[in-house]
């Protein structure tokens, strides 16, 4: 099961992403929600997660400060109403950069990209047969 956290200080945006995630990936488990840099750092220290969905502008600063305080090697889908932070986001572990309001198809595409890069593909019977024969 994929575990993720959502870092978002706007209640409406949080509810929308949560709704979309339940619809698009019902098998994913949200392990926590943070609304500030401080809460996000504490959440990262406590939770073992596979993915982060992170708003860039939080009420107490830019979310990049989270990773200065607590560096992580976790894939991140950034969300924001501003396109000026894209370059900085991609220098981190960014899987994607979604502009608000978030489009469900774009979130789905970002999740597919995450899955292609980070989730092991189940071996088909034909692949297992090849392994047994040649390895």
Regions found by a protein language model. Name each.
Residues 27-35, 43:
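Short hydrophobic/Thr-rich beta-strand motif most characteristic of the beta2 strand and flanking loop
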Residues 8:
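Conserved acidic carboxylate
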Residues 1-4:
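Extreme N-terminal starter segment of soluble prokaryotic enzymes
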Residues 22-30, 59-61:
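Short, charged helix-to-loop "capping" segments that act as catalytic/coupling loops
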